[in-house]
Amino acid sequence: YNPSMHALCVFCGSSSGNDPAHLDLARRFGAALARRSITLVYGGGRVGLMGALADAALAAGGRVIGVIPQLLMDKEVGHTGLTDLRVVDTMSERKWLMGELSDAFVALPGGIGTMDELFEAWTWTQLGLQRKPCALLNHRGYYDPLIAFLDRAVEAGFLPPRHRALLLVEQDLESLLDRLEASFGN
């Protein structure tokens, strides 16, 4: 049995942000997943970075699975053109199912929802509830303040260095995908 990365869960903003480079990053990331035949698992939205990510993966012939709570479907932000859209009851179920369907996790730029998802997945790995890599794509230094905080948490004795090391950080999307795939030995 040779484990490999077949599906990647991507957390990112339901907004586009005010820097067009982030939207471009989401599109390039979606297309890169399709090129590598990696299924995109994401939060199921049709707007913001989430929508751009999914649309680009689909346009490049990729498989896209969205997981969205009924609350957001009711607000009509669900993406109806996906390979598969799973509707769940709660935000917690959404995170759990996204994790179940994925081999690894990546956060692109986003806000507190993105942070919530990344930190929960990272906590699952830290606690041994799963053995899936977690990564941060630090595009244009967006996450520099977060990385500085994590280093501060290590210095202050609240984050063991071995747990800090569980979060991979890259600035380039292809380097990040290469590193994730290498962690599976494929």
Q: What is each of the regions a protein language model found here?
A:
Residues R86-T125:
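Internal catalytic-core helix/loop-beta-alpha segment
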